[in-house]
């Protein structure tokens, strides 16, 4: 389930009521992120929640680290409570489940599509894949709501929160009402990365499945 957050995705935790054009400041922060941040690294916490408002209940929490280089190169590593790795080299997405010692390979173009991963790790053609709408400001974080234009996606909305030009969080809700909140900390923008930083090596003895 966890890897679906990136490769097939979800949508907004907050059901934004306002449908006006997005605030210029929030839009500028989003555009600045997708065009100005060519690479980054940091840490994330991922929470699965149910309910809304005061009735929100956390049903699961995981955390880990990430690093990416646009377009299409990234490492998304879960470290708690279980280890799992999602890594892409620009052409292929590799999903490694340590407990099963199993690697799943997917063509990257089909795996990203109009997903949250496309926003974080893809190119900067957001207008091609999403409709951007205004969201609220909560605790100093300005939110945008992105709705995929494609009809065959597995999610409804993606909420993106920025503060002082930094990506703070993503709120995701899928078509089945499942909700995921991603929060980001310690993000370093445009750090130097080794040429082979995203080269995937199949772990010894691992089974490989191609999709």
Swiss-Prot record:
GO terms under cellular component: outer membrane-bounded periplasmic space
SUPFAM superfamilies assigned: Prokaryotic lipoproteins and lipoprotein localization factors
Similarity comment: family membership: Belongs to the LolA family.
Range of residues in the leader sequence: 1-24
InterPro entries: LolA/LolB/LppX, OM_lipoprot_carrier_LolA-like, OM_lipoprot_carrier_LolA_Pbac
Organism this protein belongs to: Cupriavidus taiwanensis (strain DSM 17343 / BCRC 17206 / CCUG 44338 / CIP 107171 / LMG 19424 / R1)
Major localisation: periplasm
Complexes and interactors: Monomer.
Protein purpose: Participates in the translocation of lipoproteins from the inner membrane to the outer membrane. Only forms a complex with a lipoprotein if the residue after the N-terminal Cys is not an aspartate (The Asp acts as a targeting signal to indicate that the lipoprotein should stay in the inner membrane).
Signal keyword on record: yes
UniProt keyword terms in alphabetical order: Chaperone, Periplasm, Protein transport, Signal, Transport
Gene name for this UniProt entry: lolA
The protein, known as: Outer-membrane lipoprotein carrier protein
Compartment annotation: Periplasm
Chaperone in keyword set: yes
